[in-house]
Amino acid sequence: MKTVHSASYEILRRHGLTTVFGNPGSNELPFLKDFPEDFRYILGLHEGAVVGMADGFALASGRPAFVNLHAAAGTGNGMGALTNAWYSHSPLVITAGQQVRSMIGVEAMLANVDAGQLPKPLVKWSHEPACAQDVPRALSQAIQTASLPPRAPVYLSIPYDDWAQPAPAGVEHLAARQVSGAALPAPALLAELGERLSRSRNPVLVLGPDVDGANANGLAVELAEKLRMPAWVAPSASRCPFPTRHACFRGVLPAAIAGISRLLDGHDLILVVGAPVFRYHQFAPGDYLPAGAELVQVTCDPGEAARAPMGDALVGDIALTLEALLEQVRPSARPLPEALPRPPALAEEGGPLRPETVFDVIDALAPRDAIFVKESTSTVTAFWQRVEMREPGSYFFPAAGGLGFGLPAAVGAQLAQPRRQVIGIIGDGSANYGITALWSAAQYRVPAVFIILKNGTYGALRWFAGVLEVPDAPGLDVPGLDFCAIARGYGVEALHAATREELEGALKHALAADRPVLIEVPTQTIEP
C-alpha cells in the first residue's frame, strides 16, 4: 500500500529535492522514518542556521531547497532567516511537523495553533492540509508555488499522524507533473521601451539581484555595451549582477533617496532591471528622481512594480525581456564610459589590519569563479571597490539585512556548488547569530573558508549612531570573543592572522584544504 509518506518522497525525488535541511523534533520523526538512501539530511543545531543553509543552497544552485522545521517553536527560530529568504526571492519549501490532528484543537504540547498564519507575511503561500490524503497534493503545490515567478519561500504544516495514512488514488500523477512559467511583456511595450532607450540623450542602467538570479548578467553587459550606458548596482545589493571591473560598472547606489538622485543626476532615462525601486535604508529625504529624468523598471515581481513610488514598469521574465530588448535598441555612437580607477593599496601602521587590506589579499588569492558570501555591513563599500567579481552567482548578502546569514549561507552555497570555492566574509557581530553552522560545516566536511573580520563592535551601528546623533547608545561593542577557540570547539580548523603576511599564508592554506577552515582577522572599524 502506498502511503502519504512514500508518495511525498516520490514527489520530492521527482523535483530533485533530495537534500533536507532540518533540526528534528518529535513531530518530525515520522516524516524521517525509513529515510531514503538517495536523500541526504543536513542537520543544523538551530533553525536559524537551518533556514540560512537552505537559503544559501537555493541561491547558489538556482533550485528550490527543502526545509523541515520543528512545529511552531522551530518555525519561530527560523523566521529571522526567513526575512532574508523572502527578500532574496529564495524558493524555499518549508515544512513543519504538527501535532496529531485530534490533539491540535486542545492545544496539546507542540500543537502549532493557526499554523498557516504563523510565517506570514514572509511566505508566498502557507497552508495546513485539511486531511491526510491532501498532503501529497499540497506538497506538490508548495513546490510549484515556490518555483514559479516571483520565486519565494512557502510553508506547509503537516500533522505527524498523516504520514502513515494511505495515499489517495491517482497520487502518481502528482510526481509526473511539470509546471513552467515565463512571461514576456507585449511586443509593443518592448518596442516602445527600445525606442525610448535609443533616443535617450544619456541613459543609465541600474541592475538588481534578480538579474543574477535569472543568470542574465551577460545580457545586461550586452545592453550596457550596445547603448554605451554606465551600469550601477541597485542599493542594498544582495547579489552581483554585473562584472565589477567592466568599463561600464559604476558601483553600488546608496540606499537613500537623496543619494540616489544625486548620483543619477544628468541622466534623462533610468532603466532599472531586476530590482525594486528602490530598497532604501537610511532616511535621507529628497527628490525621488533627478530633474528631467524618467524611470522604467523591468521586474519579475508584480509587488515590486506596484509599490514603486515613481516611474513606469514592465513585469516579465528578466532574461527573456533583456534578450528581446536587445533586439529593439539601436547601437549608440557614444564612447564607452571610462573604467573606474583601481583603489591603491593602503599602508598598514601596525595594530589591526584595515579591511581594505583584507580584501586586497582576498582579491589576489581567490579563484576566478569564487563565491563570496558577505555579511559585514560596515565594509560593504570597500569590498565592492576592491574584490573583482566576474561570474554569475559570485556574491550573496542578506537581502533583508537580517544577521545570521553569512556562516549558514556559506555552508549551503558550498554544498550547492562543490566545484566552486565559497569564501564567507563575516563580521564578528554578525557571526554569532549563525555560529552553529560551523558544526554542520565540520560534520559534513564542507570545504568553505570563513574569514571573520574582528573589530569588537557592531561597525554599521557605530556609523548609524553618528548619523542619528546617538553617541551614547549602549550595547554596540562585542569584546572578548575568541573565534579560533569557538571554531575548534565545533570541530573546524581555525587560524589567527594579525598581519598581511599571516593572512596570505592562512588563506593559501585554507584554499588548498579539503575541509572547512576559519580565519580570524583583527581589523579596524570603517564606515559603510
Curated annotation (Swiss-Prot):
<dbReference type="InterPro" id="IPR000399">
    <property type="entry name" value="TPP-bd_CS"/>
</dbReference>
<keyword id="KW-0460">Magnesium</keyword>
<protein>
    <recommendedName>
        <fullName>Benzoylformate decarboxylase</fullName>
        <ecNumber>4.1.1.7</ecNumber>
    </recommendedName>
</protein>
<feature type="binding site">
    <location>
        <position position="118"/>
    </location>
    <ligand>
        <name>Mg(2+)</name>
    </ligand>
</feature>
<dbReference type="InterPro" id="IPR029061">
    <property type="entry name" value="THDP-binding"/>
</dbReference>
<feature type="binding site">
    <location>
        <position position="455"/>
    </location>
    <ligand>
        <name>Ca(2+)</name>
    </ligand>
</feature>
<dbReference type="InterPro" id="IPR012000">
    <property type="entry name" value="Thiamin_PyroP_enz_cen_dom"/>
</dbReference>
<dbReference type="GO" id="GO:0030976">
    <property type="term" value="F:thiamine pyrophosphate binding"/>
</dbReference>
<keyword id="KW-0786">Thiamine pyrophosphate</keyword>
<keyword id="KW-0058">Aromatic hydrocarbons catabolism</keyword>
<dbReference type="InterPro" id="IPR029035">
    <property type="entry name" value="DHS-like_NAD/FAD-binding_dom"/>
</dbReference>
<dbReference type="GO" id="GO:0019596">
    <property type="term" value="P:mandelate catabolic process"/>
</dbReference>
<feature type="region of interest" description="Thiamine pyrophosphate binding">
    <location>
        <begin position="377"/>
        <end position="460"/>
    </location>
</feature>
<feature type="binding site">
    <location>
        <position position="457"/>
    </location>
    <ligand>
        <name>Ca(2+)</name>
    </ligand>
</feature>
<feature type="binding site">
    <location>
        <position position="117"/>
    </location>
    <ligand>
        <name>Mg(2+)</name>
    </ligand>
</feature>
<dbReference type="InterPro" id="IPR011766">
    <property type="entry name" value="TPP_enzyme_TPP-bd"/>
</dbReference>
<dbReference type="Pfam" id="PF02776">
    <property type="entry name" value="TPP_enzyme_N"/>
</dbReference>
<dbReference type="GO" id="GO:0003984">
    <property type="term" value="F:acetolactate synthase activity"/>
</dbReference>
<keyword id="KW-0463">Mandelate pathway</keyword>
<dbReference type="GO" id="GO:0000287">
    <property type="term" value="F:magnesium ion binding"/>
</dbReference>
<dbReference type="InterPro" id="IPR012001">
    <property type="entry name" value="Thiamin_PyroP_enz_TPP-bd_dom"/>
</dbReference>
<keyword id="KW-0479">Metal-binding</keyword>
<feature type="binding site">
    <location>
        <position position="428"/>
    </location>
    <ligand>
        <name>Ca(2+)</name>
    </ligand>
</feature>
<comment type="pathway">
    <text>Aromatic compound metabolism; (R)-mandelate degradation; benzoate from (R)-mandelate: step 3/4.</text>
</comment>
<dbReference type="GO" id="GO:0050660">
    <property type="term" value="F:flavin adenine dinucleotide binding"/>
</dbReference>
<keyword id="KW-0456">Lyase</keyword>
<comment type="similarity">
    <text>Belongs to the TPP enzyme family.</text>
</comment>
<dbReference type="GO" id="GO:0050695">
    <property type="term" value="F:benzoylformate decarboxylase activity"/>
</dbReference>
<dbReference type="Pfam" id="PF02775">
    <property type="entry name" value="TPP_enzyme_C"/>
</dbReference>
<keyword id="KW-0106">Calcium</keyword>
<dbReference type="InterPro" id="IPR045229">
    <property type="entry name" value="TPP_enz"/>
</dbReference>
<keyword id="KW-0210">Decarboxylase</keyword>
<comment type="subunit">
    <text>Homotetramer.</text>
</comment>
<dbReference type="Pfam" id="PF00205">
    <property type="entry name" value="TPP_enzyme_M"/>
</dbReference>
